[in-house]
Amino acid sequence: MPGARELTLRVERGALFRRRWAASAASSARAAILRDPRRCALGTRPRWVSFLVIVLVIMNVVTAHPKYPNDPLALVLIELRHPRTEPPVPSAISILKEELARWTPILEQEEVRQVNLETGEHTAHSQKKLVARDRRTAITFRPDAMTLEVTDYPGWEEFRSIVHAMVTARQDVAPVDGCIRIGLRYINEIRASLAEPSGWAYWVAESLLGPGTQLADLKLTTTAQRHVIQCEGPEPGDSLTLRYAGARGAVIQSTPFLQRLKEPPAEGDFFLIDIDSAWSDPCKGIPALDAHLVDEVAERLHTPIGPLFESLITSELRTKVLQQPGQE
């Protein structure tokens, strides 16, 4: 019978092999979807094995990308949409605050302005918000949804535990009638030097960059770009939306209630990789909202996010930027 050290070495070698295999499979899947994004348009049924199926299969052996020292994550959020209801009364808010005090002990009131697109009428209302002392975690109970937002991502296990506590507390104190949609979103702003002649192609997959060479041959200069790819997931009701673009400034802005971990340069270049993984009932029903449902669905929605991100960046970005604390 092998000793403990030999067993450890076998496990490590097996894990290394699986990581390499998964990275290769994810890269092939990413290349396939970006060669012909129409095959994954929402509402169509691809005749080949879908990109998301491949990613979700390889996730049996690969977990999400690590939290890098110089992490590009600007915001991670989950939104649990439910039938519109009255906001929790003050006494219920006090209990929610107490139940979630480990993460968000501060009660704030946010003024929200909305515009009616049909009439042009402006309306304003206030909503309660629970925030962390460092203002990098916020929980909001809106009339039609509850959300958790973090700008200093603690990792999936801790994030998931906050989600579980949020849902449990809300349903114990001021329950909502059901679940319409669950959305999990990771917004990355990649910042790196563009001194290399290849520009962003040095840092991200070249297939993300569009027909730059062809445009340059016609003496056309790209001034803005934004791409959206929508995919059906392997499970009924699952979908994934990938948004990516080169841009300047920032997508995520600090607010009085939610501060960015690092304030970006006002006019700095960045590359956006925004992954939005979502579920809604495939039969158009409204199932009961409880922590068990959210745990199960959120785990499944989270599954492809890390491998997809890792397949869209280069090893140069990983080693020269993301793994270097304090560098941009």
Where are these regions (language model features)?
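Long, compositionally biased interface segments
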Residues: 268-328
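Aromatic/basic-lined ligand-recognition segments
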Residues: 57-58, 65, 125-131, 181-264
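N-terminal low-complexity, intrinsically disordered segments
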Residues: 55-143, 147, 289, 322-328
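Secondary-structure boundary elements
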Residues: 155-157, 161-180
